[in-house]
């Protein structure tokens, strides 16, 4: 009886000790995470004298900015613990390395670059895709990176700024084969969340998660993605992305994916989260008209492969953060 009693008391003491330890340690972990704002940098691609891709009725730079501002406004309105920083908030030209520099100087938790896709020679395609840093696995992926990186040609000193990088030369992209990104796993996961929302919330064709050598992602020292909202070269998609409904719905999809990522991030660090992801019924905006199912493909195996590669790659050397102060237009 004495043995059983002492063992019972021992269990009580153990529980009390564990509770005390939790009270001492857990709140401090939670408060340390919530002591500072979660910082997200939203990058509207192109701008100013760089129009980006040009469609029949619009320019890419304006679509990108419109959606970027809508995403930022959704976050500001609903997340008082998030600091939103834009690389540009109006029609100005911002050098490619400066965009990443803004994010690095702000010690951002996420970098989201928003773009609009295009195909040459009057070819058409539909759907949204999300990209992470890596070696392009196909000629088509390489062409997307070349097009986005070619904006450095608007900079007079681009050869010096980007160490001789030629955005139109396949040889310049060999560097991405040997480069490792310690944020790859988080970036691929965020990209997967984006694609899920583009398909489920926005009702757009899911073109999947891809990798390519984007300079703006290479220079950012945090989980980073580049979104292609749709194809400005496809008249139907161009009209959709220029409509209030289309831009608003795409922004809502990006916002919901951001909330899901933030919630998972908090749960992983502290076991608790203040972030609430609203259900479809709780939101005012109605989904956009669904695209044909034939436009969608099963991209789950591809995304799982990228995640597996991210987990098996060794941690990379941290990317260097530029030292100039933040000056946001």
Language-model segment annotations:
Residues 256-329:
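Pro/Ala/Gly-rich low-complexity, hydrophilic intrinsically disordered segments
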Residues 34-165, 180-184, 188-192, 248, ...:
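Catalytic-core regions of hydrolytic enzymes
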Residues 17-29:
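Bacterial N-terminal signal peptides
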Residues 4-6, 113, 233:
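Short linear Ser/Thr-Pro motifs
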Residues 1-16:
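Single conserved hydrophobic/aromatic residue that forms the stacking wall/gate
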Residues 52, 171-273:
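Active-site-adjacent mobile loop/cap segments within catalytic or ligand-binding domains
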């Amino acid at each position: 009886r004495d043995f059983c009693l002492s063992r019972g008391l021992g269990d009580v003491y153990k529980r009390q000790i564990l509770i005390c330890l939790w009270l001492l340690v857990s709140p401090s972990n939670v408060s340390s995470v919530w002591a500072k704002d979660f910082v997200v940098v939203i990058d509207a691609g192109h701008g100013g004298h760089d129009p980006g891709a040009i469609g029949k009725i619009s320019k890419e730079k304006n679509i990108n900015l419109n959606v970027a501002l809508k995403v930022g406004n959704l976050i500001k309105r609903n997340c008082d613990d998030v600091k939103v920083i834009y690389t540009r908030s109006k029609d100005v030209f911002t050098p490619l390395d400066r965009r990443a520099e803004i994010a690095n100087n702000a010690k951002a938790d996420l970098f989201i670059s928003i773009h609009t896709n295009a195909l040459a020679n009057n070819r058409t395609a539909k759907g949204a895709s999300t990209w992470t840093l890596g070696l392009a696995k196909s000629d088509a992926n390489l062409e997307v990176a070349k097009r986005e990186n070619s904006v450095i040609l608007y900079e007079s000193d681009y050869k010096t700024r980007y160490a001789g990088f030629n955005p139109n030369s396949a040889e310049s992209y060999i560097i991405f084969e040997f480069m490792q990104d310690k944020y790859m796993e988080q970036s691929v996961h965020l990209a997967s969340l984006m694609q899920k929302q583009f398909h489920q919330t926005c009702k757009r064709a899911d073109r999947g998660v891809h990798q390519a050598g984007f300079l703006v992602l290479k220079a950012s020292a945090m989980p980073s993605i580049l979104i292609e909202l749709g194809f400005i070269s496809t008249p139907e998609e161009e009209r959709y992305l220029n409509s209030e409904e289309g831009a608003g719905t795409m922004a809502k999809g990006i916002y919901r994916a951001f909330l899901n990522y933030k919630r998972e991030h908090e749960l992983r660090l502290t076991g608790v989260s203040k972030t609430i992801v609203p259900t479809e019924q709780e939101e005012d905006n109605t989904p956009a008209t669904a695209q044909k199912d034939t436009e969608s493909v099963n991209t789950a195996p591809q995304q799982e492969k990228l995640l597996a590669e991210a987990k098996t790659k060794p941690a990379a050397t941290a990317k260097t953060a530029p030292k100039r102060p933040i000056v946001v237009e």
